[in-house]
Amino acid sequence: NVTGVQTCALPISIPTTVPGLDVCELMPQHAKLAHQYNVVRSVCHTFADHGGGHKRMMTGRIPATPVDTVNDAPCTGSIVAKVREGIDRGIPNYISMNPGGRVNDVFAQGPAYLGQAYLPFNVEGDPTTPRFNVPNIAPTGTSAERVDDRMKLLSGLDRIERQMDGAGVMSSIDKYQQRAVSMLLSDRAKKAFDLSLEPETVRDRYGRHCWGQRALMARRLVEAGVSFVSVVMENPYQSNVPWLKQGVYNWDSHAVNCHIWDDLQVRLPIYDQAVMALIDDVYQRGLDKKTLILVTGEFGRTPRVENSIGTQTGVKQPGRDHWPQAMSMIYAGGGMQTGQVIGSTNSKGEHPADRPLTPNDVWATVYRHLGIDYTMAFPDRRGRPMPILPFGEPIPECLRA
């Protein structure tokens, strides 16, 4: 009963189905299904600010500025959308699901010099609420013939503007139009976003909360042919999860923001249910060879707990600060051999002791899975060729077996 959570004892570790791998007791599904994923323990970088950490993790490039949230290099999803822009399945190749009210660059999901045509198609809000709606995926009172007529008229009207355009703006607009019309004339997107088509038992398995239903929608989108789906699990305190006074909106678990152990009593079971339901479902439905799942944040948290006065509670409470020197993440699916632990840290969890890896290695692995040459380059705004990854190699254990 999340409404009754108070200051609790420290959580303990429990064994998993992988010998030698323990996880927090608040994540029983991670323990039960550990044989279906790999844990990478030794990823590290040097950007401790949220903005710099997001950009470093999501682009595979060293950000020009260590703070703020505007990408100076394209995120991986935008690269995938660029490479696969010729593939039209009536649904975008890059989709992001997030709480809403934020711009894409808050989560370092911007396209930078690739242009606005490679922004993700945003799905905002809480899919569990009755008012949840994905706009612009089906015509409203407009037949396919009328949509076609209007596009022909628009083509004539913008011819002069196109001749005057020297910055490629019209090209980006064209791609938006093509994507929008393709979605309007196909019911693929409408069906993929419609969670009511799922059995109630499946929706229950993912959890009747925003994280669970976003994870379920991600699986449906991949089945519909979307190449890259990003699910932002930021605020669990939405529908069916009452706000906890000593909790925090996101994972920023400084002591001034939250009582970390109380917050995790709510947060981790929701995360555990949503992520493991997705991974297990992907295997049960035979999608594990073509679908690669990556679970990560922008950096780790300090190995040592700090204590400060909480701004919401007014009392001293425990928390953890930013720590990019070492972090763990999960890979699943992708046809890889699972049940592995890759890399290690020193005994205090401070820095890698074995197999130090970077975000570049993380994304080189993803690009390899997608069949994308991770050494390719695209021109920046000055026309200079910019490699999508200036360095890095795929993690062998996380490639197709």
Where are these regions (language model features)?
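Ligand-binding pockets and gating/stacking loops
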Residues: 5-401
